[in-house]
Amino acid sequence: MRPRKDILVSGCFIVVTSLLVMAIWWAWRQYVTDPPYVDPEQFPVRGIDVSSHNGMMNLDAAARDGVEFIWIKASEGADFRDANFALNYQKAQHAGLKTGAYHFFRFNRGGVEQALNLLRVVSGRRLELGIAVDVEEHGNPRTDSVLQRLQTMTEYLNLRGYRVTFYTNKDGYAKYLSEYFRGFPMWICSFTDDSVGDDWAFWQYDHHAKVKGIQGDVDMNAFCGSREQWDSLWRRPVPGVAYPLRPEK
């Protein structure tokens, strides 16, 4: 017969192990969430967003797989530049994808210095989708400071002919953008529903999509408009920078 102490230790080990397995499963479910159903009739135009983390890509194959547009990471903060931007941009243009560049906004750096960092990467390039500023909550910055820096960066880009789209999730939208940046096209990350807002231009609905020509997972997005609205954008003159992409409702 096993000693009572050994039985208690074994029982505690089983309980702790079970709790640990449950915690890991719960955390995994929070991270790997089944994407919402995206009605292809309501959202017929799909695209991806990429960075150097996606590695080497065959964007011609991605285009044949139904991808029609791409957002490419260009820069972050005041001094980081994505090492693969130039190559990814070249591949996107060769594949015929409508292309935009995005900048990850750092709350602790000034708006002008971040705009300058971005422009050093994208200047002279044709960007049909224009520029997106990625606003994601991190740290605990003062809201008024964030808004001031965002406004400074946006105005700096606007004065140089660039129309800005904002990327964020619903929390970031409510905290920073909904009141102070009305009228700007929004690119919203949401994995829960398709309740598209009136100012949504793009909807990121999946972080784990599979696309031919890309190894591993890739972010998938939908244009928040009809096929006709999408096609009508490209009948306008494209100046090499951006113009409003939010579809008319």
Give the residues covered by each predicted segment.
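Substrate-binding cleft of extracellular glycoside hydrolase catalytic domains
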Residues: 30-35, 40-63, 74-154, 158-163
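Short beta-strand/turn micro-motifs composed of small residues
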Residues: 103, 168, 190
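N-terminal Lys/Arg-rich, disordered targeting/topogenic segments
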Residues: 1-7
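Structural recognition of alpha->loop->beta junctions
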Residues: 119-133, 176-199
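Aromatic-lined carbohydrate-recognition surfaces of secreted/lumenal glycan-active proteins
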Residues: 161-174
